[in-house]
Amino acid sequence: MGTPNPRTWSELPPDLLGSIFHRLSFTDFHRAKIVCWNWNLSSKLTVPKKIRSPWLMLFPEGDNEDGSVLLFNPEEEEKIYKTKRYFSGIRFLANSGKWFLLIDSLFNLYIIDVFSENKIDLLPLEESLLDKEESEDLTGLLWVDEKTAEYVVVLFFNFPSGNVGFCKKGDDHYTKIPLHCGVPWRLQGLIDAVLLGYRLYIRTELSYIRILDLSTQQGFEDVNKYEPFQVFSSTQDCSIAVTTRGEVLLVKSILDNTTIGSHRRFCIFKNIDYNPQEEVDSLGDEALLLNLGILLPSIAPNSIYFTRHGRIYHKEHFNLDLCVFNLETKTLKRFPSLANMKLKDAQWFFPGI
């Protein structure tokens, strides 16, 4: 039997390729479309299987010889995928859907689609924003519109005493956001933030909520139309989240340690400018990705997807807890296949956005 001609794979007829693509999982679909030009063209005529659940991006500890990171789909608990891209010396700062914000060892910033070769180079970092000796403290938030390719990048430099800057598609510089100088005392500082579209929601040092519109031509605009409201919280293990309607929620995490293990539970509150607050017992048909602070449609509605606290403050040591909490049944799900993995970090993301 002769050796198969490798060219024949790229010359398969479109109808046969379409039949193949229809049978592939979401991950294999995106792998297949970068095999060659013809496969990529055929993939555009095929609708991939719909993603119904958030995924985990896993970052292993220690030396990673091939520079890859791992992908975990909760619907396929026994499968862990490895990216084909080379990510040695690169830090993942934030994500929006399948797009991730990265910084490399030369301090270059860019956005990538983890399932394709698509890449967006960002503006060079300005010395006035970043002290490169403290670049390990750089964190960020990202929003990408899949339909229009518009994007917003928010960067947090050298916290807790540092700067905030942002850029959006078409900008030729980073715009600084003052946190103290010229800012009313209740709206000064930052301990938590959520980016939803062009709006940045900041929880200030005194736990007031500051809302910024980043879409203006002049840079940004404070849009607190009413008296800014204060978040009442007696615990540090809490985060803000924002609904699709722009309502700010407070999410509290409580870890109960016992002799037989630990159990984590969550409480969500709305009308958070009042005391006592109103507890939320349902998220409708949406789920909360707490590392992003936003709600999305999901196969598991009323669920909270959790990895760790601290979106903004980068810490060398923190406790990862990869779990999903059902708000209705008050039950917690962890993943046995990940229990023995040594990870330095993990992020939930939603490939289907």
Swiss-Prot record:
UniProt-listed InterPro entries: F-box-like_dom_sf, F-box_BR-signaling, F-box_dom, KIB1-4_b-propeller
Pfam families under this entry? Beta-prop_KIB1-4 (PF03478), F-box (PF00646)
Task: Report the domain of life of the source organism.
Answer: Eukaryota
The F-box domain covers: 6-58
- Record SUPFAM superfamilies: F-box domain
Q: What is this protein called?
A: F-box protein At2g14290
Q: Which organism is it from?
A: Arabidopsis thaliana (Mouse-ear cress)
The organism's lineage is: Eukaryota, Viridiplantae, Streptophyta, Embryophyta, Tracheophyta
